[in-house]
Amino acid sequence: ATRTRGALTMGTPVPESGRTMDRDDAGYESARRAALWRTNVPQRFPDRIVQVSSIDDVVFAVRAAKAAGQRVSVRSGGHSWSGNHVRDGGVLIDVSRLQAFSVDASSMTATAEPGIGGSVLLAELMKRGLFFPVGHCRGVCIGGYLLQGGFGWNGRAFGTACSNVIAIDYVDADGDLRH
């Protein structure tokens, strides 16, 4: 099934577990407000909010937005004082549901999706005698934290979070998954 509204077509690659909302859909305003951790929500309104549940959802949402000539912004945890990810027009891709992670204690590495909170990841790492310099505020997700450089309280001792990353898998502006 394909759903078209306002020049952006979303089809079956967005699974039942994901959710797509246009401005006039039920749940849009609560999703827009929930895209920020603070209560002072800017008066900016994306044309569509896509709450993804998989990397495939992200790929599809980016490709659909590109095909429609729409700008894309991304939210992982919404811990942005300015709320710069909530823009007028375009598509807001909410990756906060992407919270899977795995830890390989023998190689001292972890793999984590962008919606996992740094405090959650750190707690799991510490159970295994490992550490990662996460943000100092509870609820800061690693996706946005890393995009901002990963500056936290432990930076002087351990470096920025970005300097502790071995590799990143990401979806580029064309909607292609890269490593």
Pin down the residues of each PLM region.
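Active-site and channel-lining beta-strand-loop segments
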Residues: 101-102, 160-179
